[in-house]
């Protein structure tokens, strides 16, 4: 159960990051978003000490590359927010810094308050 919640939270965080980045041709499923962000969960539940896990950055970069259209980015955002709502202990301060730490630049704040409809 905790693993499922962690995966959902990671999905939410990554999805928010993906909101600024594009998702590949066609639609991206919530399962794909969640799987891409799952490696980020333990980092986001911790103190932020140490490096971001390589798998986390790989997932963030992959989602960023995949989100090529506004509808796909908005859908990814919704998926991430939904998943994050089911995960406890996420440090959203760390989440907002993940894109930069992974070398990805997105023009949106990663936050539970992000309005997915405003994602372009």
UniProtKB/Swiss-Prot annotation:
PROSITE patterns tied to this protein: PLANT_LTP
Signal peptide feature range: 1-26
Cystine crosslinks: 40-56, 57-102, 77-116
Pfam families referenced in this protein's UniProt entry, alphabetically: Tryp_alpha_amyl
GO molecular function: lipid binding
Biological process terms in GO annotation: lipid transport; seed trichome elongation
Alphabetical UniProt keywords: Disulfide bond, Lipid-binding, Signal, Transport
Function: Plant non-specific lipid-transfer proteins transfer phospholipids as well as galactolipids across membranes. May play a role in wax or cutin deposition in the cell walls of expanding epidermal cells and certain secretory tissues.
Similarity section: Belongs to the plant LTP family.
Protein name in UniProt: Non-specific lipid-transfer protein
Native species: Gossypium hirsutum (Upland cotton)
Lineage of the organism: Eukaryota, Viridiplantae, Streptophyta, Embryophyta, Tracheophyta
